[in-house]
Every structure is written in structure tokens, then in C-alpha cells.
């Protein structure tokens, strides 16, 4: 099943707390169906979401209508009321979020307020329910593309810098050492794109916008 939670609706883009589950085998003709799910504790849009073991989902951060950025987080479950968990040190809207092989969750970069972005990276421990900081990104950035690599490391590519510069740089987080290190540059500045790890271990970075803020149909 697929969880869709939060977001914004209406003329004023008001955040919602509702969730919806998509069942690909549901419906009369088994073409898929949507059903209502357990609501979040806090209405939020642009939150980070990562599936944890045992059908739990970490929902962290996000924002409300008035551009207040949340550091709070909660654990969503399909059958019971959500449970509040530890808070992040800063907000990470439009950052990168990835589940690591050790079960922890990496949340890095993103927007921390209506005037600044961050290089801070944090790890969520689902056992203790707490966040702790780890090695930061090389610079503050948001709207990056992120992908988990086959060996458990995490690629962070492109995005926007704190001076609104369009980035081609990329870096890799190694959970074994707890550090970020430089990687190759994208041939094209790209922000707001997506990254997908392929079966051969390579990463496809596609779509997003270029340095002129024009939509891209290309891929690297």
C-alpha cells in the first residue's frame, strides 16, 4: 500500500492532517482504491516521510500556512493514533531524507526558516525516538536530489545554495564513518529534481529546474 499524508488544500494552501491509503489491488475490478487513514497529530505540508519497519512511518518537519517551519516529528501507524517522537534541532523542509541500513534515518539540509536554509544533518534513532546531529553538508542547500546507494551510502546532488546559486555539486554520506564527502559534479545545474538508483548501481538524476529556473526534461 501507499501512504499519502498531509499536504495543503484550499485557496490559502491550508495544511491538512488527514492521510489516505492507496491499495493497488483494491476496488471492484482490482485496479486500485483509496481509503481514509489515521490522521497526523499535526497538520503539516512539505513534511519528510520515511517508512520504518513494522508498517510505521516517520513524519518529520513540514510547515503551516504562515510559513512556520516545524522541527517536531511523529510516528504514523495504520491502525492506531500517531505517537509524537523526538524533535529535530532545526527544520529541514525540502531537504534530503533517507533510511540507512542500520535502521536510522538521515535528514539533511533544507529550509529552516523563511529567511535561511541549513547545512545541518541529523540522524533519527527509531529505538530511542531521538534525533542527533551528524556531520553537516559541505554547504547549506535545499531542493537537492537524494538517493540511497547499493552499498548503504546516500547521494545528495544539486539543489540551491544559500545565495540562491544553482548547484552542480554532489556529495555522499557514509553511515559507517558518519561523514559527508565530495562526489562528482552534475553536467547541468539542477534543483528540485529526483534521483533514482538503478539496478546497475548507477544513479539517474532527472527533471527539476535549471539555472534559468526553466523546467528540465533531461536526465544525468
Region spans (language model):
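Kelch-like beta-propeller repeat domains
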Residues: 1-220
Amino acid at each position: 500500500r501507499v501512504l499519502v499524508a498531509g499536504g495543503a488544500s484550499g485557496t490559502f494552501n491550508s495544511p491538512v492532517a488527514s492521510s489516505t491509503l492507496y491499495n493497488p489491488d483494491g476496488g471492484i475490478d482490482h485496479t486500485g482504491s483509496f481509503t481514509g487513514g489515521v490522521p497526523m497529530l499535526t497538520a503539516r505540508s512539505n513534511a519528510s516521510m520515511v517508512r520504518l519497519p513494522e508498517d510505521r512511518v516517520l513524519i518529520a518537519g513540514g510547515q503551516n500556512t504562515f510559513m512556520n517551519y516545524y522541527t517536531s516529528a511523529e510516528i504514523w501507524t495504520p491502525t492506531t493514533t500517531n505517537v509524537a517522537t523526538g524533535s529535530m534541532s532545526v527544520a529541514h523542509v525540502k531537504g534530503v531524507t533517507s533510511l540507512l541500513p542500520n535502521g536510522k534515518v538521515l535528514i539533511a539540509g533544507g529550509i529552516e526558516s523563511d529567511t535561511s536554509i541549513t547545512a545541518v544533518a541529523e540522524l533519527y534513532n527509531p529505538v530511542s525516538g531521538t534525533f542527533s546531529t551528524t556531520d553537516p553538508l559541505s554547504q547549506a542547500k535545499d531542493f537537492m536530489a537524494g538517493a540511497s546507494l547499493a552499498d548503504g551510502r546516500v547521494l545528495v546532488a544539486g539543489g540551491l545554495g544559500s545565495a540562491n546559486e544553482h548547484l552542480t555539486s554532489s556529495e555522499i554520506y557514509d553511515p559507517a564513518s558518519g561523514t559527508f564527502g565530495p562526489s562528482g559534479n552534475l553536467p547541468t545545474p539542477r534543483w528540485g529534481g529526483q534521483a533514482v538508483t538503478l539496478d546497475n548501481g548507477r544513479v539517474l538524476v532527472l527533471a527539476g529546474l535549471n539555472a534559468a529556473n526553466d523546467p528540465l526534461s533531461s536526465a544525468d
